[in-house]
Amino acid sequence: MDAASGILPDYAELFCRSNFSFLHGASSAEELVERAAKQGYRGIAITDECSLAGAPRMHVAAKAVGLPLVVGAYFGVTPDDAAPGHDPGPGAFGLVLLAQNREGYGNLSELISWRRMNAPKGTYRLTPRMLAAPPRALAHLRGVPDCFAILVPTYPARADVLDAQLAWFDALFGERARLGLVQLQRALDGAHREQVRAAGERRGMHIVALGDVTMHIRSCKPLQDTMTAIRLGMPIAECGHALAPNGEQHLRTRQRIAQLFPADALAQTCRMLDACHFSLDDLRYEYPHEIVPAGHTPTSYLAQETWAGARRRYPDGVPDTVRQRIEFELALIADLKYEPYFLTVYDIVKYARSKDILCQGRGSAANSVVCYCLGVTEVNPQQSTLLFERFLSRERGEPPDIDVYSTPFSTDGRHACPSAFCLGTSPP
């Protein structure tokens, strides 16, 4: 607190794990957001361990109360030579990555996918080598561009170890690098705080206050202890120092936070919050551009293929009622800018049939004469009284579902078709 004015400094929590950090986080995304808003936080980050699973719920909850949200993730980083499953020693540290923009979110997503596909469940550790020299196919993830990187030192910090880590960290992440300070009312908090302060000063790196939050209120501590015991596979009474010594890993009051952290470290949380501009609302369906031939726009190509299909479906002439339906549907599709979606499904179906893979659209797509003319469905909407708006409407706010069913005997083809389409090459 500012002693002169009595005004509490602003604060944003940038290290917060929900119950999507399995057997670590004790509170739901909704509980965390509600508590942060009640405490008057400027914003909050969701940083589950090697996961973005909690981000959608956190996004919805934060949006409902007008609380700025940063999407990120937490990783344990162990020395390159540390044996899996063994104590990594003082060289280990925590890493909080925060997406600054959509590109950063994409890079963070790729990093998480890479680790989850290449590590046993629950052991999604990184090493300095992985971050600095990822495989060639993932070379663009070096230093995880467009993400803030916060080094969370092992407690209690050692000057020699921290200096070496910060030299490497600064070289890799540059201006995006920050040094995290966690204060949880433990015996060596004072010494830890001084080591972090001195190391940051020597390296010229900004220090940021972190709560290392795993629960929204202190009374969740028994639940967190229970989850720790389950994770370790032993009774609570035998967990000893593996249990958190107190309930400080909750969203504390701003008065308490102001007492624990230097003003600069608190101000840094808000500067980082303001520099992160990504929202899940920025995500949209994206479709390949290659499906539209040169000289066409998605609108003109969809119209061309639809009318060509109509002439095949109705060789004796397209009935006026069908013509009107086609014009109505094409106009609505163009207005909603869904042409790439319809063309993507059309391209998949064309590819499947070129390989004699039996497939057919079903469900509410049968309400659409455009789908019928494109050959996606085989039910003539003219012969039914189905409601087109059940399939596509302005109010829905997202592309319709077009289920393309492949028969059980074509399992290999069913897998090969989308794989080939996504890769842009024919399957072997």
Task: State what each model feature region is.
Residues 1-18, 28, 32-33, 37-43, ...:
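Conserved active-site carboxylates
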Residues 26, 52-68, 83-85, 221-225, ...:
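Glycine-rich loop at the start of a catalytic domain that most often binds anionic cofactors/ligands
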Residues 196-202, 341-358:
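Short, hydrophobic/aliphatic alpha-helical segments
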Residues 18, 44-50, 362-366:
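Ser/Thr-glycine-rich phosphate-binding loops at phosphate-binding pockets of nucleotides
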Residues 50, 74-76, 185, 214:
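Catalytic metal-binding/acid-base residues of hydrolase active sites
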Residues 25, 29, 51-61, 162, ...:
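Active-site-adjacent beta->alpha loops and helix N-cap segments on the catalytic face
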Residues 12, 45, 207-209:
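Residue-level marker for buried hydrophobic side chains located in beta-strands
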Residues 103-104, 208-219, 352, 356-378:
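Conserved phosphate/anionic-ligand binding catalytic regions in large, soluble enzymes, centered on
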